[in-house]
Amino acid sequence: MIENRRGLDIFCHVMLIIGVLLILFPLYVAFVAASLDDTQVFQVPMTLIPGPHLWQNISHIWHAGVGNNSAPFGLMLFNSFVMAFAITVGKITVSMLSAYAIVYFRFPLRNLFFWLIFLTLMLPVEVRIFPTIQVIANLNMLDSYTGLTLPLMASATATFLFRQFFMTLPDELLEAARIDGAGAMRFFWDIVLPLSKTNLAALFVITFIYGWNQYLWPILITSDASMGTAVAGIRSMISSSGAPTQWNQVMAAMILTLIPPVAVVLLMQRWFVRGLVDSEK
């Protein structure tokens, strides 16, 4: 029995190592390409030894962009951060307050309102996106941070998750708060919000990555290069006119784009994992 268990452990670790290598190898190739110059990156086969031009490529795209794209990539990263952070804060705020109202306030048709929110999950993005663009255009929000972020702040999934968590809180907490004279918002700030920290952390990480990785929405809502985001900007760096693509600079842009979401995951890893575990209980 012990030998079988040891064999299973070895097999699992081997598969884990293989999986890690399969994930990291493309990233390593991108890192190597980002460190080469214009001629080295087109050599066949391309070298797998990092070159000395990484900071040169990063500095160039940070200030000048790549190819026909005149927007500095540093500005694109800033736009992506503003978009991701605003979507994250807005989505958490709207979803948490909506779920709190549905669970703790008694008003007519509150369950109907919840299920109407939940039913939006059944609508494909392609069905909702063009009417949303029309609304944003009518409100003169094209090429603006408001247009980039406001339509993505509502989340049926986050509302559902917070509702399920709030329903697990014992009713005695609400009764004790009422005895102490606490109002609805006092109960929310002093009791519900602190108990939701791990769930907030997990949702913060997931939502930030969701906002950071937005590709289709920024392309449709912006035409000004200065409002472009990093993920959409990388695609615009790839030449479609027959001219050679500067892959070393494109890969440098990709490396920079990876840093913020990876940093968020690493900084909030403990609370993220705890939030996922707590949400399953």
Curated annotation (Swiss-Prot):
It is found in: Cell inner membrane. Residues 77-268 form the ABC transmembrane type-1 domain. Keywords: Cell inner membrane, Cell membrane, Membrane, Transmembrane, Transmembrane helix, Transport. InterPro entries: MetI-like, MetI-like_sf. The chain crosses the membrane at residues 14-34, 82-104, 113-133, 142-162, 188-210, 247-267. GO terms for biological process: transmembrane transport. Its main location: membrane. PROSITE patterns: ABC_TM1 (PS50928). It comes from the Bacteria. It is a multi-pass membrane protein. The keyword Cell membrane applies. Part of the ABC transporter complex UgpBAEC involved in sn-glycerol-3-phosphate (G3P) import. Probably responsible for the translocation of the substrate across the membrane. The complex is composed of two ATP-binding proteins (UgpC), two transmembrane proteins (UgpA and UgpE) and a solute-binding protein (UgpB). Belongs to the binding-protein-dependent transport system permease family. UgpAE subfamily. This is sn-glycerol-3-phosphate transport system permease protein UgpE. It comes from Yersinia enterocolitica serotype O:8 / biotype 1B (strain NCTC 13174 / 8081). The gene is ugpE.
